[in-house]
Structures are given as C-alpha cells and as structure tokens.
Amino acid sequence: MTNIRKSHPLFKIMNDSLVDLPAPSNISSWWNFGSLLGICLGIQILTGLFLAMHYTSDTATAFQSVTHICRDVNYGWALRYLHANGASMFFICLFLHVGRGLYYGSYIYTETWNVGIALLFAVMATAFMGYVLPWGQMSFWGATVITNLLSAIPYIGTDLVEWIWGGFSVDKATLTRFFAFHFLLPFIISALVVVHLLFLHETGSNNPTGIPSDMDMIPFHPYYTIKDMLGVLVMILALLTLVLFSPDLLGDPDNYIPANPLNTPPHIKPEWYFLFAYAILRSIPNKLGGVLALVLSILILALMPLLHTSKQRSMMFRPLSQCLFWLLVADLLTLTWIGGQPVEHPFIIIGQLASILYFSLILVLMPLVSIAENHLLKW
C-alpha cells in the first residue's frame, strides 16, 4: 500500500514541499533563512492575534490599551515584546535572505525573485503600520512624516494623502484603517509566500557554486529539516534573549510618550530596519527626488537580473565582485547609522556620499567589474 503522505491529495502537497523535495547536497547555512522567515511570520501572526484581542484602535484609548496589555494581561508584556522584537528578527532574516540572493545569484530565477520583492514591500508596509498602532509620539509623527511623502506626487499628491489619512491630519480614522490593514496584510503575505515557494519549486534551489545541481540532489527530510532546526533554535534563543533582557533596546524612548499633535519630537526617525532607506530619502534636498530615491532603493533589486553581466552565476569564485559586495554591505550599515543621526554637518555629507555609493555600486561598478572578471578568465 502506498504511504498516505504520498497518496492523500493534501498530504502529497506537503510531502512534495517539505519531505521528499529534492535539494542540492551542498547548500550552506545561508539557505536557512527561508525557513526562519516562515517561523518569524508564524510568530508574528500568533502574537499579533492575541494582542489584537486586547488592543483598541481608537486615539483616546490606543496608548492606554497597550499599557493595559503590558501591565494587566497575563503574559501580555511577553506577547507585546515578542511581537515588537519579532519584527526586528524578521527584518534581520529578510536582509540576510536578500543578501544571500545577491551574493549567490539567486535573482536569476526572476519569478521567485520578483515575488520576493513584492513580499519585501508588503512586510515593510505591515511593519510601518504596526509602528503607528501604540499611538506614542514616534508612532504619530512617523505616520505623519511618511504618509506626507506621498504629497510629493504631482497633481494627485495632496488628495491622495488626505484620502489615506481620512481627514486633514493623522487622526482616529487613520489609526483605525492602519489597524485593519496591519491585521490583513500578514495573511496576504502568507499567500505570497506560497506563490514564492511555488515558483522556487518549479526551478529547484540554487546552491553556493551557482552550477546546476540536478545530478546531485538529496531529500529535504531528514537532512535539511535537521539543519533548519538548528537555525530555528539559534534565532529563538536570540529573540528570547532580546525580549527577556533588553526588550526596549531597538525601540525609541519617545514612543512611551502618548501622541501629541502639538509637540514635535526633536528627531523623528523610523524603526532601525528602515533607517538605510530613510537616510537615502533625507540625502536628496528635493521632496519628489527623495521619495523616488527611497522607492528605488528597494525597487533597484528588480533590476538585478538585467544587471548581471558575469558568465558565472555565483560570486563564490569572483574575488573582485566579492569586494564590491562587502563594500555594499558596509555602505548599507553606514546608511543605517546616518539615518538615526540628526540632520547636521558632517552627517548630511556622509549620507549623501553613502547614497551615491549605494546606487553607483549596484548600477555601475558591479556590472563593470563582472565584465572585467569575464576577460580575466580568458588569461
């Protein structure tokens, strides 16, 4: 008799995706982040669901309801900080996952890559709206500043902003709709994850060498299920350490002050995972130009398959490209640091130089160095 996991219509799908899936025999720990992102999404949906049971999306009570969750609800503090720091873990895994894709040329699978970019935008939108919900000072002013950027769109900008706000400023209507979308989007993200995996399983996984591995595959279970479990344990250990020892390490103290439209915080800044894009936005002294640069800083990922000029897929055997890749990583860390600094000398010029370097590396330097490496191969 055939095993039920291979014959049952529902179990068969799970089996072909998680058990008998042929996987390359040489994929490294950099391939663990997909499963970690799945775990992160699960943690966020579960903790978010329980938080939503106690949260009220009304400007008069939102801040108080979050305080109530932390003080009066059983393990409410744990739920709240798991959710807040879970978002940080989510973005750490996301950035490493995307970085892996850039380094090893995974973007050659264009459908999987493009769905991944859509996922990145969806997760960023969800995180932004979630940051508004506690209705602290940084929630309110962050929402005001970021939504106001849409007013830079010619002709329809102002109407668009007022339509999103549901009035003439960020208020009750804005908070209610942000809560609704913040609740809805993770389920859309879950659907996109299924599409992402669907496209990935059409082609099979890439591997560190970038060479097709069709002739040397191993079953996903038990080899990679065990390997993924190690990654999960390390991530959960890191998350619990953050939650139990310094839950406010990555947050902003201003968000413990209730939202006040009459009092602007000295430095309005988003959560740490948006700081690199925020630095790029601020480095251009024109509103529309800044908004375009902000969007392009992420959307530029969609150009990666077109900018691939190397004869090799992976950077594993391309030392010059590796140097530029790690320069890009250092540049992004610099931008993240600058995004959290006040707009004054010397931070302005550092941010502008880092922004120029970011786009130059991706659009010009990396493709040129790849062409040079192709010629060096002939020697």
From Swiss-Prot:
Binds 2 heme b groups non-covalently. The cytochrome bc1 complex contains 11 subunits: 3 respiratory subunits (MT-CYB, CYC1 and UQCRFS1), 2 core proteins (UQCRC1 and UQCRC2) and 6 low-molecular weight proteins (UQCRH/QCR6, UQCRB/QCR7, UQCRQ/QCR8, UQCR10/QCR9, UQCR11/QCR10 and a cleavage product of UQCRFS1). This cytochrome bc1 complex then forms a dimer. Belongs to the cytochrome b family. Heme b b562 binds at H83, H182. It comes from the Eukaryota. Its cofactor is heme b. Heme 1 (or BL or b562) is low-potential and absorbs at about 562 nm, and heme 2 (or BH or b566) is high-potential and absorbs at about 566 nm. PROSITE patterns: CYTB_CTER (PS51003), CYTB_NTER (PS51002). This is Cytochrome b. One of its GO terms (molecular function) is metal ion binding. It comes from Dobsonia inermis. The keyword Heme applies.
